[in-house]
Regions:
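A hydrophobic, multi-pass inner-membrane permease signature
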Residues: 1-293
Length: 293
């Protein structure tokens, strides 16, 4: 067993301490939001809630889950993730596979690669983007949230580099055995690229779940808003229509701050539950997809 030098031990100790401090600082806002969401309106208004609930209650969550606007926005986002993520992953694979081939198999590979890279570095601006979507008749439709970003270029580059790292001898042996490129992609490349596939899947999932700007721009009706667009309007709005609630007990335990905190935490919860299971694939896919080529 190799013994670590003093300098190496010092570096690792400093590294762990620094990362622990940064992780703690990142958790503080989330813990504060969670504590506020479980606190009474009186405690939240008095600004005495720090990192532990004061006068614990679940009224904010009960009211948040009963609001049709919140439920509709949640459903739109779930549908967007379930439909948009597979579309992103499938199209990314179909684009990355031919671009990973040699020039003798795909003559215009470098040209198309630069076209994709150019679109990642430069864009036509907000107004041309909006006019294009409007011309396609997608304004105020669900597909406006999915199709404009159906082929994420960064994911294409990541998967492209991963595909190039697969030994060519495997593909050549499969071609000799009579496999088509479709079969090579689905039976050989995809199983070997599981970490990269998991990485781009996580990118797509988080991107769809956290996207808010396109919903505000492309949706005319609030009932078509995805969750993050709804929360964005909620954060800047001071009128949450709480006065529609008749029960005096509920009114005494809910205010704007506790309701916002509960809805923000409910919006972040699915990602927090999903990420730990994909983290190992995420790190491996990022490292291998960035160094191979």
């Amino acid at each position: 067993m190799t013994r670590l030098s003093f300098g190496r031990k010092f570096f690792l100790t400093f590294d762990y301490i620094l990362l622990s401090i940064l992780a703690f600082l990142c958790l503080l806002p989330l813990v504060n939001v969670l504590a506020i969401s479980f606190s009474s309106s009186t405690a939240a208004t008095a600004n005495i809630v720090k990192f532990w609930p004061v006068d614990f209650n679940l009224k904010s969550y009960t009211y948040a889950l009963s609001k049709p606007e919140f439920s509709d926005a949640y459903w739109v986002t779930i549908k967007r993730v379930l439909i948009g993520t597979p579309i992103n992953v499938i199209l990314t694979m179909l684009v990355a596979y031919p671009l990973s081939k040699d020039d003798r198999l795909f003559r215009w590979r470098k040209y198309y690669s630069w076209v994709f890279i150019f679109t990642m570095l430069f864009n036509g601006g907000l107004i041309p983007w909006y006019m294009t979507i409007k011309t396609l008749g997608l304004i105020d439709t669900f597909w406006a949230l999915v199709l404009p970003g159906a082929v994420p270029v960064f994911s294409v580059i990541l998967l492209l580099n991963f595909f190039r790292g697969i030994p060519k001898e495997i593909e050549e042996a499969a071609l000799i055995d009579g496999c088509t490129h479709w079969r090579i992609l689905w039976r050989i490349f995809l199983p070997l690229s599981a970490p990269a596939i998991a990485t781009i899947t996580l990118f797509a999932l988080v991107g769809h779940w956290n996207s808010w700007f396109d919903g505000l721009i492309l949706m005319n009706k609030t009932e078509h808003y995805p969750l993050q667009s709804y929360l964005q309007t909620l954060v800047i709005s001071f009128d949450l229509k709480i006065m529609n609630v008749k029960e005096a007990e509920l009114l005494s335990q809910i205010n704007n701050r506790t309701l916002k905190a509960s809805q923000i935490f409910l919006a972040a919860l699915p990602i927090m539950l999903t990420y730990p299971f994909l983290q190992k694939y995420f790190m491996k896919g990022i490292v291998m997809g960035s160094v191979k080529g």
